Amino acid sequence: MPQEIKEVKDFLIKARRKDARAVKIKKNETNTKFKIRCSRYLYTLVVKDMEKAEKLKQSLPPGLQVKEVK
């Protein structure tokens, strides 16, 4: 089941959970989508600023599998 997250802080909290498995990053011309797979939900965060997206990508937990989709 998908759920959209509006705040970056909430997304980082979800990324640090034990049941978080993988993150897919989808880049567009206008925005970047971060999709994190947890056991029950697929959480999505849409970031419109490319610099913020790069900072968020670097602040993801190191044990998480990151896959970039174009």
From Swiss-Prot:
GO biological process assignments: protein-RNA complex assembly; translation
Please name the InterPro entries in this protein's record: Ribosomal_eL38 (IPR002675), Ribosomal_eL38_sf (IPR038464)
Q: Which Pfam families match?
A: Ribosomal_L38e
Instruction: For this UniProt record, give its keywords in alphabetical order, as a comma-separated list.
Output: Ribonucleoprotein, Ribosomal protein
GO MF term set: structural constituent of ribosome
Q: Where is the signal peptide?
A: none
Q: What are the GO cellular component annotations?
A: cytosolic large ribosomal subunit
List residues traversing the bilayer. Answer: none
Family, as annotated: Belongs to the eukaryotic ribosomal protein eL38 family.
Annotated protein name in UniProt: Large ribosomal subunit protein eL38
State the organism named in the record. Anopheles gambiae
Cite the source lineage.
Eukaryota, Metazoa, Ecdysozoa, Arthropoda, Hexapoda
Name the gene for this chain.
Answer: RpL38
